[in-house]
Regions:
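N-terminal domain-onset segments
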Residues: 1-46, 55, 71-222
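Short, solvent-exposed aromatic-acidic interface loops
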Residues: 63-71
Length: 222
């Protein structure tokens, strides 16, 4: 998964200049303090997904603002967010992180919107299975169609991690209005080929190759 996300982050850098990085789907940085790789996926609706990799394992935290699991919906229906409603919201947030090993939970720093969470999953380094938060559905879920399963946005947000170049291209053709010439270049990046000027030109002729290489090297993507 980490390799896939790095490839997507490189493709987003190619498609969008650094000044407009807010438009990118996947952003990446390395947290020196916690020694972990930090990826953030930002949907066009403002929902987000953090994927954190460390030597202790992987932590994924997502937020779908329309989900009935959104902590902020607990305040709806009240004239103001009184002390009781705030206490209930904080308790609900804590329950989302219940069971996560301390070494993984410590990776979630202040700037990662800790209170904005509708699902959480993690995997210890010595395991192959994923653990998920076991949170009872709040009363806000009762207002939804009983035939619709609310997973906190997990399926929708995790779908932004594209396993193949074909799937990335299908998304990028709409989001970035990517030309057909870009498909082969995207496939070569997915195949871990060295990034060339021709590949950049095929994907986005408006971007400067050297500035892309510089940003990728500084961030640790190359």
């Amino acid at each position: 998964m980490k390799t896939l996300l790095k490839k997507q982050a490189i493709l987003d850098i190619i498609m969008t200049p650094e000044d407009d990085d807010w438009f990118r789907l996947v952003s990446y940085r390395y947290d020196e303090n916690n020694r972990c790789d930090v990826f953030k996926i930002t949907g066009d609706d403002g929902d987000h997904l953090y994927v954190l990799f460390s030597e202790d394992g992987t932590l994924i935290k997502g937020c779908d603002h329309e989900s009935c699991f959104s902590p902020y919906l607990l305040d709806e229906g009240t004239e103001d967010a009184d002390a009781q409603s705030q206490s209930e919201r904080l308790a609900f947030i804590d329950s989302m992180y219940h069971g996560i090993p301390k070494s993984l939970l410590a990776l979630l720093t202040e700037d990662m919107e800790r209170e904005a969470v509708t699902f959480c999953m993690w995997q210890n380094a010595d395991e192959t299975i994923w653990h998920r938060s076991q949170v009872p559905q709040p009363d806000t879920c009762l207002q939804q169609d009983s035939n619709v399963l609310d997973d906190g946005g997990e399926k929708r947000l995790m779908a932004y991690i594209f396993p193949s170049a074909d799937q990335w291209y299908e998304w990028a053709a709409i989001y970035y209005e990517l030309r057909e010439e870009g498909w082969d270049a995207a496939a070569r990046i997915y195949d871990s080929e060295e990034l060339t000027r021709t590949m950049v030109e095929d994907l986005n002729p408006d971007r400067d190759y050297d500035s892309i290489i510089d940003e990728c090297e500084v961030s640790g993507l190359l």
